[in-house]
């Protein structure tokens, strides 16, 4: 089949959207098509990241997507409150969709269902077959038997308040709340003096979260903070995978076609944040000299395997969080972590821990029972 495009991106979410934008910047003559079954690119999400998660070059090229930026953020635990002087950034799916629409226009096909994805073609449900030199599947997380995961499940609501909330920076983790049989915290982003995004977040063993309970949790938390909720502007929900263990070779045997983002297992193993790795993949693909289905598949799988090798320590920490000690005491692990030096915490989020950092994290009295911690560390699959 004669290719209609150089690249077809199936799924117009974060990872594929960033690939498209970076390729357009670096290789403006490339013919790119994005296809998604949803009505709006990016869906209904808020993506956040820390300053040190990206290089200065990466900050520059994604700058048009950034809607909010704060110079610091807060965490709260039963016996620890702390402000961390690290920049925190936010991209909204609305801005993301606007930028993609402006840049790709007729080559952004929304409300378009795909029936079959192949290495060099896509068949739509309405029957049309479109050829390309390469295809990338970025349609979000798909369960894979090679990975054992927990989930960070959440419901977030954006509210307009009747009076100013008084927050000058995000509270990315408030674990002073009732734990409700797992590690639970509330996440709050101040979007304006009278607008807040409030997320009820749970680290749990499966992706299911009672939406009515989460909504009530948000209302209760707002009341406890003295925030007077006036108008619900938007609601989002999600379940980010948190990797406990797995087999990278078996994972990629189940992914014979090029894929991106959560589908490629490219997310921070402990936080579930996917934007930094999506930016890195976009950079890597935009630098390819040869652009074929084989070269793209090789570039993504090689990158993902590199990250898998680097993330073993994080997976061990995740097992301690999910498998060691009572579920309603998991907050102790995170409370202890946030007492560590600020530069170490920044490297943790960026996935760039040094050997000294790792030793520092494990030193001292463990926040969970020693035997349970050792059993969790030795667990390779649930």
From Swiss-Prot:
Which InterPro entries does the entry mention? Answer: CrtY, FAD/NAD-bd_sf, Lycopene_cyclase_b/e
Record's keyword annotation contains Flavoprotein: yes
This entry's Enzyme Commission designation comes to: 5.5.1.19
Query: Which co-factors does it depend on?
Result: FAD
- Which cysteines does the record link by disulfide bonds? none
Q: Which Pfam families match?
A: Lycopene_cycl
Main localization is membrane
Q: Which domain of life is it from?
A: Bacteria
Q: Where in the cell is it found?
A: Cell inner membrane
Which reaction does this enzyme catalyse, per its entry?
a carotenoid psi-end group = a carotenoid beta-end derivative; all-trans-lycopene = gamma-carotene; gamma-carotene = all-trans-beta-carotene; all-trans-neurosporene = beta-zeacarotene
Show the GO cellular component annotation of the record: plasma membrane
Task: Report the outcome of residue 199 to A.
Answer: Loss of activity. Still binds FAD
Pathway membership: Carotenoid biosynthesis; beta-carotene biosynthesis
Q: Name one GO molecular function term.
A: lycopene beta cyclase activity
Q: What does this protein do?
A: Catalyzes the double cyclization reaction which converts lycopene to beta-carotene. Also catalyzes the double cyclization reaction which converts neurosporene to 7,8-dihydro-beta-carotene via monocyclic beta-zeacarotene. May also convert zeta-carotene to bicyclic 7,8,7',8'-tetrahydro-beta-carotene.
Could you say which protein family the record assigns here?
A: Belongs to the lycopene cyclase family.
Name of the protein this chain belongs to: Lycopene beta-cyclase
């Amino acid at each position: 089949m004669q290719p209609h495009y150089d690249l077809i991106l199936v799924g117009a979410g974060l990872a594929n959207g960033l690939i498209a934008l970076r390729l357009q910047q670096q290789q403006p003559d490339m013919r790119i098509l994005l296809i998604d079954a949803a009505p709006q690119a990016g869906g209904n999400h808020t993506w956040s990241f820390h300053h040190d998660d990206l290089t200065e070059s990466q900050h520059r090229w994604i700058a048009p997507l950034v809607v909010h930026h704060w110079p610091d953020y807060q965490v709260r635990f039963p016996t620890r409150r702390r402000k961390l002087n690290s920049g925190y950034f936010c991209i909204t799916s609305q801005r993301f969709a606007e930028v993609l629409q402006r840049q790709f226009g007729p080559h952004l096909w929304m409300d378009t269902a795909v029936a079959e994805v192949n290495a060099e073609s896509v068949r739509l449900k309405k029957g049309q077959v479109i050829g390309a030199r390469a295809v990338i599947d970025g349609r979000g997380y798909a369960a894979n038997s090679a990975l054992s995961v927990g989930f960070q499940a959440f419901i977030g609501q954006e509210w307009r308040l009747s009076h100013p909330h008084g927050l000058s920076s995000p509270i990315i983790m408030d674990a002073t709340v009732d734990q409700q049989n797992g590690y639970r915290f509330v996440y709050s982003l101040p979007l304006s003096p009278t607008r807040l995004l409030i997320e009820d977040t749970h680290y749990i063993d499966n992706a299911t979260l009672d939406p009515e309970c989460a909504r009530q949790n948000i209302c209760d938390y707002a009341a406890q903070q003295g925030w007077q909720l006036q108008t619900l502007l938007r609601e989002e929900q999600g379940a980010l995978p948190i990797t406990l263990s797995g087999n990278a070779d078996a994972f990629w045997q189940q992914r014979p076609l090029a894929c991106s983002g959560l589908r490629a297992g490219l997310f921070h193993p402990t936080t579930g944040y996917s934007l930094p790795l999506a930016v890195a993949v976009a950079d890597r693909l935009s630098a390819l000299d040869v652009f074929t289905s084989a070269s793209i598949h090789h570039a993504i799988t090689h990158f993902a395997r590199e990250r898998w090798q680097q993330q073993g320590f994080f997976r061990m920490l995740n097992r301690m969080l999910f498998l060691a000690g009572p579920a309603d005491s998991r907050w102790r692990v995170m409370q202890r972590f946030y007492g560590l030096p600020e530069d170490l915490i920044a490297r943790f989020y960026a996935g760039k821990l040094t050997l000294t950092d790792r030793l520092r994290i494990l030193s001292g009295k463990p926040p969970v029972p020693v035997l349970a911690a050792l059993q969790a560390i030795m667990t390779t699959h649930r």
